[in-house]
Amino acid sequence: MGVISGYAGGITINPTYERVSAGDTGHAEVVKVIYDSALLSYEDLLTVFFAMHDATTLNKQGNDVGTQYRSIILYTSDAQKATAEAFIVKLDNDVATGKIVTELKPLKEFYDAEDYHQDYYENNKSVPYCEIVINPKLAALKEKFNSLVG
């Protein structure tokens, strides 16, 4: 199990952080999740995904604004697509959730982000962004999903 930071969902071949940040590649900043489906279900991943970010505001996460920050699910199978569609319908039917704006599309190509983006939190725990943004998210993740993240 693990994650790889990267870019996907756009049109530019071999995008860089600078190009993606400029908003002209069509790519979103994404994370490839590598997991064992015998230990963690795709629905579990969707539960965590929707609980840990704002899927109701278009092109914005926290103070980060732009299409590269859009909520997006890039599926790799028809089964993943169907599961994600059903999950989104269930959330849309929950009045308290708000309208889900998450983009759902097939993964065509995933591009690894630059090395300095990989394991960013582990390598930069004392950076203000990690202390102010990531630490509270990790605490919430552990509190809400301790059985999944251990």
Each model region followed by its residue ranges:
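Flexible coil/turn and secondary-structure edge motifs
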Residues: 1-150
